[in-house]
Amino acid sequence: MKKIDFYFDFASPNAYLSHKVIQKIKENYDVEVNYIPVLLGGIFKATNNKPPMEQFFGVKNKNEYQNLEMQRFIERHELNDFKMNPHFPVISLQIIRGAVAAEMDGFLEDYIDKVLVHMWEEPKKMDDPEVIKAAYEESGFDGEKLMTQMQDPEVKAKLISNTEAAVERGVFGLSLIHISE
């Protein structure tokens, strides 16, 4: 059985796009997926990288071409529910900490599925605590508990550890998929 390590942060539309394709792969192949929440901003800082919108600002046609490639990917994989979040870029620190808390409590995949909907299908301002809590409640999660867990030192430490381990593994941007036997 092949194993997929999927490093992700909800801040990137690529998290949504990659996750949806991974779901199709899981349906058709014998694979195990290990979801690893990391902080994209922390990866950028550690690797001296920048978001594409910033890095390629002023490079004629670069961002336009990147948007065209994204649209082609969406069409190719029939990801018709995707919508660019009008609040983009969203500071994802709280919801990615929520992913770590969900992982610790055993419902990470469900959490990912639902938070990605709130980010990229029914776009919400997912860096506003009131919006986040309401989205959690709408998803059937205990919003109060998750909001509290985001501040837990153990959750914070695990996110830092995941992010540092990703950088040590060579990650410099997201989403990243590592496949092994």
Outline where the language-model segments fall.
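Structural alpha/beta surface segment adjacent to cysteine/selenocysteine redox centers
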Residues: 17-119
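Conserved small/polar residues in nucleotide/adenosyl-binding loops
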Residues: 178-181
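Thioredoxin-like thiol-disulfide oxidoreductase module
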Residues: 152-171
